[in-house]
């Protein structure tokens, strides 16, 4: 099947300045992400960035770049600019791969594209089971609950679903009911155009989760269990050192 990967790569980062260009074992991080995307079999891969240094690094690795504005409030807004500049048809399947995921398995990039292509829905994503209490109660681990058909009912930083009887006895085990959302999305290009036309929702501001805008406006998001678990993403200097060690 045919799909396009877009990798948003914003240069500024409060916790890790110049993040796309940090060195991981001899290569800029954004080049590692580009290589994982190539392994997925995508028809076209575009790095969307607001900085010339990132563009030069990608082009030196043989990648395609789309320069975008620096004032976007979200990665989805940056995607929308690329969709318009490249003139993608409304039914084009686009996978948004985060630019700080150098260890993302190529198989899940393709998985989210295939899941979307098989359904009459505008957006798809992935999740993995949560097995530790630490992760279940961590607000940085976003949880998702699904309906019987695998569509998202809600995303939250809170522990959902709340296992009343189990947690009344102990908060040290979580059972097998919690799912952690992964930050990879598949969209149809026409859906991205609609998404950015909607006003931000109250829920996305409360939880700071932009995917809640989709549910707020009554649209569906399909969620599948990922075929592989992504490695560590890079948000901080500590994450960077961990990834360098894991990728040696």
Curated annotation (Swiss-Prot):
GO biological processes: CMP-keto-3-deoxy-D-manno-octulosonic acid biosynthetic process; lipopolysaccharide biosynthetic process
Cellular component GO terms held in the UniProt record: cytosol
Pathway: Nucleotide-sugar biosynthesis; CMP-3-deoxy-D-manno-octulosonate biosynthesis; CMP-3-deoxy-D-manno-octulosonate from 3-deoxy-D-manno-octulosonate and CTP: step 1/1; Bacterial outer membrane biogenesis; lipopolysaccharide biosynthesis
MF-aspect GO terms: 3-deoxy-manno-octulosonate cytidylyltransferase activity
Cytoplasm as UniProt keyword: yes
Record keywords: Cytoplasm, Lipopolysaccharide biosynthesis, Nucleotidyltransferase, Transferase
Descriptive protein name: 3-deoxy-manno-octulosonate cytidylyltransferase
Organism: Salmonella enteritidis PT4 (strain P125109)
Gene name of the record: kdsB
């Amino acid at each position: 099947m045919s799909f396009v990967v877009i990798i948003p790569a914003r240069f500024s980062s409060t916790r890790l300045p110049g993040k796309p260009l940090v060195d991981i074992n001899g290569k800029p991080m954004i080049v590692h992400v580009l290589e994982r995307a190539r392994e997925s079999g995508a028809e076209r891969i575009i790095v969307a960035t607001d900085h010339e240094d990132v563009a030069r690094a990608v082009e030196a690795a043989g990648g395609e770049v789309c320069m975008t504005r620096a004032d976007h409030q979200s990665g989805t807004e940056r995607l929308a600019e690329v969709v318009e500049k490249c003139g993608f048809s409304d039914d084009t399947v686009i996978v948004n791969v985060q630019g700080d995921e150098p260890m993302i398995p190529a198989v899940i990039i393709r998985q989210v594209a295939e899941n979307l292509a098989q359904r009459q829905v505008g957006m798809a994503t992935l999740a993995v089971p949560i097995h530790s209490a630490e992760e279940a109660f961590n607000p940085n681990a976003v949880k998702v609950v699904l309906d019987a058909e695998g569509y998202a009912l809600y995303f939250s930083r809170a522990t959902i679903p709340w296992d009343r009887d189990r947690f009344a006895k102990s908060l040290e085990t979580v059972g097998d009911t919690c799912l952690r959302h992964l930050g990879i999305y598949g969209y149809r290009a026409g859906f991205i155009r609609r998404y950015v036309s909607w006003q931000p929702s109250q829920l996305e501001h409360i939880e700071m989760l932009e995917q809640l805008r989709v549910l707020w406006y009554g649209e569906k998001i399909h969620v599948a269990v990922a075929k592989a678990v992504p490695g560590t993403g890079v948000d901080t200097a500590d994450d960077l050192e961990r990834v360098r060690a894991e990728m040696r």
